[in-house]
């Protein structure tokens, strides 16, 4: 099967320099949603038609299974499909999709393909309560005879509620023949793809239809308002699927998934959470309110407290993270690790049962098991040019307000006194302290303000 995706629309109503089909829906370009659905149908050829000023489309979305053709000037949907003709295999049907209609399911498209077979013209239609603006499906004795656009429709035709979604499948050899016959003698001065219906009827080719499972599958995007509406529909669908899987959502209307979220049993997600990229939550994970989790894995029974931010992190089982914690790329936490409020961890491995509960930065570090990192501790990993690593072995106690100047190693069982600035390796099982001697000044008086 050939699949052609029309993605050349200028999108003037989007009020943006970005091509319309590259605007994100759930964190992914509209066109990418359509391409992903098309791939589920295993096409032999997949061609994207892009338009003037849309060179970003092939630049951003190039892949081995994609080919691209440019439509310039843009003279309608029929003209757009003409640009793909040299790339189409005559011996298999051609399915035509739209890059700004992102929510059509593979199941609905397969229903259309099954209806059309290899020798019929198939059209995906839908019945609308208010069909204004859409091309109407004109039937005679139940059979589709043509599609008439809104601007060209007669009053009686405007009363028709069955509309053309634009999605259709046709025998490719016949499609090429019908495209060659198209005329732009209409109100818009464009080559309408819908005019091939009349050609099919004239050739005695049966014109059949199928309908999607849901009306929203055919909704397109022409403005930021419509984009926002589709975002809510898409997020509602994701939330519904999570609920069906047994995930507890405090409010299904207040979760955003911008990628793939995989959940185990008895997962609980509070309001305002955003999941980006590939995120995996194991059994019993609890995510509190307003967390952002990007490309991360969280182990069983771990608890993420409010306002925490993860990016490319791996969290083990039974960890407690946050509130207000930040796990940056390269963070790997073993089981039962506690990362508390206003603690940032970057490119570091922290072994089991270790804790950094308050106001701490751990960067480019390897931390052993059962380590306690006191409040205000900083691993000083950057000298202005190079980044160096800090190694803290098992059973270390780091006192509050300690600075560890990397590269440095703290031996097993060592204790660092509060306020220490560590510039040399600390030996195992010993107390290391580095700070000025405390003094008390007698008869000390605070300065007084001088009146001017």
From Swiss-Prot:
Principal place where this protein is found?
cytoplasm
Q: Which Pfam families match?
A: Hexapep (PF00132), Hexapep_2 (PF14602), NTP_transf_3 (PF12804)
Q: How does it assemble?
A: Homotrimer.
Reaction(s) catalysed by this chain's protein: alpha-D-glucosamine 1-phosphate + acetyl-CoA = N-acetyl-alpha-D-glucosamine 1-phosphate + CoA + H(+); N-acetyl-alpha-D-glucosamine 1-phosphate + UTP + H(+) = UDP-N-acetyl-alpha-D-glucosamine + diphosphate
Named from the GO MF annotations, one term is: magnesium ion binding
E.C. numbers: 2.7.7.23, 2.3.1.157
The catalytic site is made up of 358
| Residue span of region Linker | 225-245
Q: Which UniProt keywords apply?
A: Acyltransferase, Cell shape, Cell wall biogenesis/degradation, Cytoplasm, Magnesium, Metal-binding, Multifunctional enzyme, Nucleotidyltransferase, Peptidoglycan synthesis, Repeat, Transferase
Q: Which NCBIfam families match?
A: glmU
Q: Could you name the Gene Ontology cellular component terms for this entry?
A: cytoplasm; membrane
Among InterPro entries, the record links this protein to: Bifunctional_GlmU, GlmU-like, GlmU_C_LbH, Hexapep, MobA-like_NTP_Trfase, Nucleotide-diphossugar_trans, Trimer_LpxA-like_sf
List of residues binding acetyl-CoA: 375, 381-382, 400, 418, 435
Q: In which pathway does it act?
A: Nucleotide-sugar biosynthesis; UDP-N-acetyl-alpha-D-glucosamine biosynthesis; N-acetyl-alpha-D-glucosamine 1-phosphate from alpha-D-glucosamine 6-phosphate (route II): step 2/2; Nucleotide-sugar biosynthesis; UDP-N-acetyl-alpha-D-glucosamine biosynthesis; UDP-N-acetyl-alpha-D-glucosamine from N-acetyl-alpha-D-glucosamine 1-phosphate: step 1/1; Bacterial outer membrane biogenesis; LPS lipid A biosynthesis
Q: What is this protein called?
A: Bifunctional protein GlmU
Establish whether keyword Transmembrane helix is in the entry.
Answer: no
Source domain of life: Bacteria
One of its GO biological process terms is:
cell morphogenesis
Q: Which family does it belong to?
A: In the N-terminal section; belongs to the N-acetylglucosamine-1-phosphate uridyltransferase family.
HAMAP family, A to Z: GlmU
Q: Where is this region: N-acetyltransferase?
A: 246-452
Any coiled-coil ranges, and where?
Answer: none
Answer whether the UniProt record assigns the keyword Metal-binding to this protein: yes
Q: Which cofactor does it need?
A: Mg(2+)
Q: What does this protein do?
A: Catalyzes the last two sequential reactions in the de novo biosynthetic pathway for UDP-N-acetylglucosamine (UDP-GlcNAc). The C-terminal domain catalyzes the transfer of acetyl group from acetyl coenzyme A to glucosamine-1-phosphate (GlcN-1-P) to produce N-acetylglucosamine-1-phosphate (GlcNAc-1-P), which is converted into UDP-GlcNAc by the transfer of uridine 5-monophosphate (from uridine 5-triphosphate), a reaction catalyzed by the N-terminal domain.
